[in-house]
């Protein structure tokens, strides 16, 4: 399934795993490729399957809209794709594709109150969109501030990381996947950025993940000159 399928599977697996998904890489691949899971003795949580499928749809939505500027509506549309099929969220009364209406907290980070979310997101989006071309540092700052606001009831990390991938594509920056095995480093760097406004550790972390993604995808990339020469020879 090429670079698209590989990225779909690895991004969905790792981003959900960071948030506590119990699905394995093999199960994620099966769900993506066949829409089903092989019968196994272990129990599988319905929520894990629903969120994995939702992440596949969110990734596709991101690819359709990667060149669009960030907006309330676009960010909410990503969250809707991720969460609209999750029964547990609906049963708990969580808003899907809309900003939170209840307080939430992440570790020792004080997130925005529900009544503060719209204004704080407006400021974040507005300040970000004032620039035309963005660097990885700009994306790092945005991600940190987005996660500190925590605008949705649940799914903020996954929505935030899909925005990172989107903005990398839009700004011709090597994209990356935050790997679950590096979750500790990710959270530590995110905490430093959120609490102390020290964005360097998070930037360094993202640069390391860029190298990992580049190495993973190298076999699928054909140099432009090789492609031109191949087309010329075939003519």
Kindly label every feature range from the protein language model.
Residues 1-154, 158-235:
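FIC/Doc superfamily catalytic core
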């Amino acid at each position: 399934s090429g670079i698209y399928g590989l990225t779909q599977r690895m991004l969905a697996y790792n981003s959900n795993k960071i948030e506590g998904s119990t699905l394995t890489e093999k199960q994620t691949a099966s769900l993506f490729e066949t829409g089903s899971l092989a019968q196994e003795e272990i129990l599988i949580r319905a929520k894990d399957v629903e969120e994995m499928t939702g992440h596949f749809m969110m990734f596709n939505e991101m690819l359709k809209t990667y060149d669009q500027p960030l907006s309330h509506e676009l960010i909410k549309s990503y969250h809707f794709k991720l969460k609209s099929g999750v029964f547990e969220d609906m049963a708990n009364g969580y808003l899907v594709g809309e900003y939170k209406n209840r307080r939430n907290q992440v570790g020792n980070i004080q997130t925005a109150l529900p009544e503060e979310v719209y204004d704080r997101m407006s400021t974040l989006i507005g300040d970000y969109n004032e620039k035309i071309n963005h660097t990885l540092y700009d994306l790092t700052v945005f991600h940190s501030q987005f996660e500190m606001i925590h605008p949705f009831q649940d799914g903020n990390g996954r929505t935030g990381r899909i925005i990172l991938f989107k903005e990398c594509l839009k700004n011709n920056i090597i994209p990356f996947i935050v790997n679950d095995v590096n979750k500790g480093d990710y959270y530590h760097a995110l905490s430093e950025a959120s609490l102390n406004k020290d964005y360097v550790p998070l930037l360094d972390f993202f640069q390391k993940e860029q190298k990992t993604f580049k190495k993973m995808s190298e076999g699928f990339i054909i140099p432009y000159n090789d492609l031109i020469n191949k087309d010329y020879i075939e003519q």
